[in-house]
Structures are given as C-alpha cells and as structure tokens.
Design a protein with these regions (language model features):
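Bacterial Sec-dependent N-terminal signal peptides
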Residues: 1-31
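Proteins with a high burden of low-complexity, intrinsically disordered sequence enriched in S/T/G/P/A and R
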Residues: 4, 12, 32-35, 104-109, ...
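Surface-exposed acidic loop/strand-edge motifs in secreted or periplasmic proteins
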Residues: 31-146
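Extracytoplasmic electrostatic interaction patches
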Residues: 128-182
Length: 182
C-alpha cells in the first residue's frame, strides 16, 4: 500500500506539473502584444508640429509632442486597426467572390500593413484636452525629403496611401482612410 501511495503521488505531481506550464490563448496574446520600444528608424517617420492651416485634420486643436511611450501605445493601436481592417476586407472579398464567381479576386486592394511605409505623425490636444494624433502612411516618398516638412497628400494609389486618427486618452482609432484606385 505504501508503494501504491507513492505511485499515486508521483502520478499526481507529474499531472500537476504538466498542467502548470500551459499558457492559455489570452496569456500568449498578451505576451505577443507587449512592446517595450518604438522600432521605426528616423528615416521612416517624422513628428510634425500641427499647423492651423491644416484645419481639415483637426478643428480647434493645439500642437503638442509625442513621447516614446506614446509612440509605443500608438503602435499597439495601429496593429489592432490593421487586423480589424484586414478582417473586414477578407469578409468583403469572400462575399464578392461568392456573388461574382466568374470574377474571382485574391485581394481587395484595401488590405493594409505597417511595414514598408513612411509615416507622418501630427499630434494635437483637442477641445476636450485629450491628446490625439493623425498618422499619414505612404509607400513612396517620390525621391525627396519634402515629406519631412510638408503633409504628403496623394489622390488614388490604393493601399499605398492611408491615414488614421488615434485618441490616446480613449485608446481608440477612427477615420481610417485608404486611398482609392483610379
């Protein structure tokens, strides 16, 4: 009986120790979403001081700056926005291919990614005293550095050009705009 008790104890310990090393999906996801540094190089982005002539970006806003930790938070929110946009695009693509089987497509042209773009960040304090930022993405700088001092505005071009607004207080994004295709 003593051997049986030791055997049961060993079996229980091995079961408990195996179970203790498992991570559930939420734990894995939180580890993957942990970002401790902003990884863009200075040649890929610029933080621009808001100019009241850019009234179409924000109304009644005041210029402000961005901290390293805010850039990291923005990156997390951007990843969420990209994932949600691309899921919506996939749903639309499936619906299109089902409705028009003779015109199958593999992408909508509005799928997005974060890598491979230049970025312009325009941070402001809005009327409510909340920090917001408009981020402009573009895959072609046309061989100049003008984009570091002037807002890059391009018509058409599809998912090569898009922009988004993020409210850092509420941690929400809005007004995701993706250029159309001519």
């Amino acid at each position: 009986t003593k051997i049986l008790k030791v055997l049961i104890f060993l079996i229980l310990m091995s079961i408990l120790s195996c179970n203790g090393s498992k991570k559930n999906a939420n734990e894995i996801k939180s580890v993957e979403n942990t970002q401790t540094e902003f990884k863009l190089t200075e040649s890929d982005f610029v933080i621009m001081t808001f100019n009241s002539e850019w009234y179409w970006l924000f109304k009644n806003a005041k210029p402000t700056e961005l901290t390293q930790s805010e850039l990291i938070e923005i990156e997390k929110i951007l990843k969420t926005a990209i994932i949600e946009n691309n899921k919506e695009q996939k749903v639309g693509l499936i619906a299109h291919n089902k409705k028009y089987p003779e015109y199958q497509q593999t992408e909508t042209g509005f799928e997005l990614k974060l890598d491979g773009y230049k970025r312009q960040y325009v941070p402001v304090i809005n009327e409510k005293g909340e920090k917001e930022v408009w981020i402009n993405f573009f895959c072609d700088d046309f061989g100049t550095n003008d984009w570091k001092t002037e807002i890059a505005l391009v018509e058409d071009g599809g998912n090569c050009y898009y922009n988004i607004k993020i409210n850092l207080k509420t941690k929400e994004y809005y007004e995701l705009g993706i250029n159309g295709n001519a």
